[in-house]
Amino acid sequence: MGRKKKSRASTTEEDEIEMDNAGPSSETSLYEVLGVERRATSQEIRKAYHKLALKLHPDKNQDDKEAKDKFQQLQKVISILGDEEKRAVYDQTGSIDDADIPGDAFENLRDFFRDMYKKVNEADIEEFEANYRGSESEKKDLLELFNKFKGKMNRLFCSMLCSDPKLDSHRFKDMLDEAIAAGEVKSSKAYEKWANKISETKPPTSPLRKRKKKKSAAKDSETDLCLMIAKRQEERKGKVDSMFSSLISRYGGDAEAEPTEEEFEAAQRRIESKRKPSKKSRGK
């Protein structure tokens, strides 16, 4: 009898442990909303985001309040998964610290976007991109994201629709400098540092030309910050988790605090410097 009771108690404990391990549905629902795997690269995440966003963009759904709300929620999703530090924190804790996206909203968003995703094809994306780049709508989104990320352009490019740092950096700089001079947005040290670097590089001859399709994630990882982030997370996840855990503990006391742009870039350099020697040692 005692054994049966113990077995039953053990079963109950196992059930509780299993439920705890399952965690809240929100733990993986950010990825489910976009219809990507948890280990998806940043390129895959951005592609899924762009595909959904072009259908929900306010300019294409001016009379649809529901579409506008979902577009805003979609932007919050990409603001987490498209940001190196926020994604690392989310992967570790499952927490998003955003009261504007309640847990039960993820299931609704996931189902809605899953249906929406099927309705979008490559032709839709190309048509949207051709009309969007260089438009007033693009400028409006640029200024909104500039304010949101406080001039941190690396993060802005991760969320900006149809953007390419190689093609758009000079163009965006001109637009932002004009907006800053007109008092539409406020400059920041992070932006000024980025703008100085861009000023020293040669602008593209045709920035609004049709963007080339990217053929290889390996090649993109050398030029696209978002892909570099994803690649490092996959290859050195343990080290990334450890590094960002220390950042989280440092800034965790203040919900508004976050690493500076210098710390953000220094963290990236540390990971790269640790990864390169390991490749050499393998070759020996």
Curated annotation (Swiss-Prot):
<dbReference type="InterPro" id="IPR056453">
    <property type="entry name" value="HTH_DNAJC9"/>
</dbReference>
<dbReference type="GO" id="GO:0005634">
    <property type="term" value="C:nucleus"/>
</dbReference>
<dbReference type="InterPro" id="IPR036869">
    <property type="entry name" value="J_dom_sf"/>
</dbReference>
<feature type="compositionally biased region" description="Basic and acidic residues">
    <location>
        <begin position="266"/>
        <end position="275"/>
    </location>
</feature>
<feature type="domain" description="J">
    <location>
        <begin position="29"/>
        <end position="94"/>
    </location>
</feature>
<comment type="function">
    <text>Plays a continuous role in plant development probably in the structural organization of compartments.</text>
</comment>
<feature type="region of interest" description="Disordered">
    <location>
        <begin position="1"/>
        <end position="30"/>
    </location>
</feature>
<dbReference type="InterPro" id="IPR001623">
    <property type="entry name" value="DnaJ_domain"/>
</dbReference>
<keyword id="KW-0539">Nucleus</keyword>
<feature type="region of interest" description="Disordered">
    <location>
        <begin position="196"/>
        <end position="221"/>
    </location>
</feature>
<protein>
    <recommendedName>
        <fullName>Chaperone protein dnaJ 6</fullName>
    </recommendedName>
</protein>
<feature type="short sequence motif" description="Nuclear localization signal">
    <location>
        <begin position="209"/>
        <end position="215"/>
    </location>
</feature>
<keyword id="KW-0143">Chaperone</keyword>
<comment type="similarity">
    <text>Belongs to the DnaJ family. C/III subfamily.</text>
</comment>
<dbReference type="InterPro" id="IPR042977">
    <property type="entry name" value="AtJ6-like"/>
</dbReference>
<dbReference type="Pfam" id="PF00226">
    <property type="entry name" value="DnaJ"/>
</dbReference>
<feature type="compositionally biased region" description="Acidic residues">
    <location>
        <begin position="255"/>
        <end position="265"/>
    </location>
</feature>
<feature type="region of interest" description="Disordered">
    <location>
        <begin position="252"/>
        <end position="284"/>
    </location>
</feature>
<dbReference type="Pfam" id="PF23302">
    <property type="entry name" value="HTH_DNAJC9"/>
</dbReference>
<feature type="short sequence motif" description="Nuclear localization signal">
    <location>
        <begin position="3"/>
        <end position="6"/>
    </location>
</feature>
